[in-house]
Amino acid sequence: MYKYRAILKRVGIVLIAVGILDIAYLVYCISQQKSYSSSLNILAVVGGVFLFRGSLRAVHIVTWFAAFMLSYFVSVFILLPFLKPAELWGTEFRLDPVGLCLSLLLTITLIALHFWIYTQLRAAPVVSESFNSGHSASTPKFAFILGVALVVLPAGMMHFTRGGAAGAKAVEIARTQYGQDYKYHLTGMSWSNGNVRASLTAYNEQEIKPVQVEWEQ
């Protein structure tokens, strides 16, 4: 019994610490008027508190979330080279090597964090105690599948959109509005009330910037 409680306390402390750091960074970004979004912060602190107190019900929830985030970030990392043209990756590295490397390092850190949380909460003492207490102790297969699907499906849809008529039209309009001096990479598209709105990345050797175009269907 003591061993499983020690594992929960260890994971709880890490989650609380990570959540507090994330909240502090969120406050900093708000004060600097920078955009920032995260899946951790408050949820990590709350989950950490429950685990620290030895809640086996929280074990199932946090394990599911860790499995989902692990598969999500691993899928993102694997698909990363294919999400942008090689030339755009090269331009990003040349213009902001530190920012790009920090972004990749953050993704790797998140993968390692969620892997550690998952393996800790799937350790034999925790699984055994959860099962004996009547809580679910099965592998969260759906969480893994959902994490992969939420990366692969949108990426696949965007790939086909770029190669379709709508993608070509978005690039054509962007060239008209923002000039021929840029190359354009489609990053998002939405349809509403007969209008189409597309988000693109415009880039050349000197700069990279986000642009938007809109047209009627």
Task: Give residue spans per PLM region.
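Topology signature of small-to-medium multi-pass alpha-helical membrane proteins
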Residues: M1-Q217
